[in-house]
């Protein structure tokens, strides 16, 4: 653990008069809680580097639940997020903070996170495809296995024109019932490919990931959604989060 690790800060808060308490996501150790001693002091060179969306190299150690930051270096400048992409980045940071246990390795998820942040930084349109892909990747890493390509009842491949209702712990079963848990075969194929060519498949992906993530998040609302509603135009909030 004393070696250098690639990492991102998910969240930070003041700790004592001159230090910071950090929630970081690392390549090798997963999510880790760190104390950055003296990081808030006037002479500290760390303050500017220990920010969300800045690619970092960190070295830390300690035996308790809270580790001590030994060294930190910014690999590059913070990825340029602003407006809707900034709130999207804050959303995925909060998502990781809520669903990942401390010190559980998720090396592949780390690169999914990096790819998502890079996609948000380069987005020229809606950030939603990048968010949905990351949510689906996160669910996969958490062990949430779902077969999007075959009917769980018959075993037959899904048909674009048929509808399938999701049943927890079973999968998608052909159904004539139309409700919030019902998806078309076309939508399921889009979820499986993680490609969303139109508004219909994007809405379906959001509906599924919200439903699938709910048990992990519990009843506590996400703060990033509330911030988004407060500071972004109402039309943007409606299309992005509702």
Curated annotation (Swiss-Prot):
One of its GO terms (biological process) is double-strand break repair. Keywords: DNA damage, DNA recombination, DNA repair. It comes from the Bacteria. InterPro entries: ARFGAP/RecO, DNA_rep/recomb_RecO_N, NA-bd_OB-fold, RecO, RecO_C. GO terms for cellular component: bacterial nucleoid. SUPFAM superfamilies: ArfGap/RecO-like zinc finger, Nucleic acid-binding proteins. The keyword DNA repair applies. Gene3D superfamilies: Nucleic acid-binding proteins, Recombination protein O, C-terminal domain. Monomer. HAMAP family: RecO. Belongs to the RecO family. Involved in DNA repair and RecF pathway recombination. This is DNA repair protein RecO. It comes from Escherichia coli O139:H28 (strain E24377A / ETEC).
């Amino acid at each position: 653990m004393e070696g250098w690790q690639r990492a991102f800060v998910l969240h930070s808060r003041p700790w004592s008069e001159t230090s910071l308490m950090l929630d970081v996501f690392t390549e090798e150790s997963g999510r880790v809680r760190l104390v950055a001693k003296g990081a808030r002091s006037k002479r500290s060179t760390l303050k500017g580097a220990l920010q969300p969306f800045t690619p970092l190299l960190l070295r830390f150690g300690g035996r308790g639940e809270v580790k001590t930051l030994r060294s930190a270096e910014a690999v590059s400048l913070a990825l340029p997020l602003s407006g809707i992409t900034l709130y999207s980045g804050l959303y995925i940071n909060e998502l990781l903070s809520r669903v990942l246990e401390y010190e559980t390795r998720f090396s592949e998820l780390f690169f999914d996170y990096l790819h998502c942040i890079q996609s948000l930084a380069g987005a020229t349109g809606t950030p939603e495809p990048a968010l949905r892909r990351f949510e689906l990747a996160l669910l996969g890493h958490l062990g949430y296995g779902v077969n999007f390509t075959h009917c769980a009842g018959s075993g037959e491949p899904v048909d674009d024109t048929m509808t399938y209702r999701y049943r927890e712990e079973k999968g998608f079963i052909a159904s004539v019932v139309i409700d919030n848990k019902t998806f078309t075969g076309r939508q399921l194929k889009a979820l499986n490919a993680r490609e969303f060519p139109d508004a219909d498949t994007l809405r379906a992906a959001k509906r599924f990931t919200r439903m699938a993530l709910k048990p992990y998040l519990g009843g506590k609302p996400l703060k990033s959604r509330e911030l988004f509603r407060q500071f972004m135009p109402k039309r943007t909030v409606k299309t992005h989060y509702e």
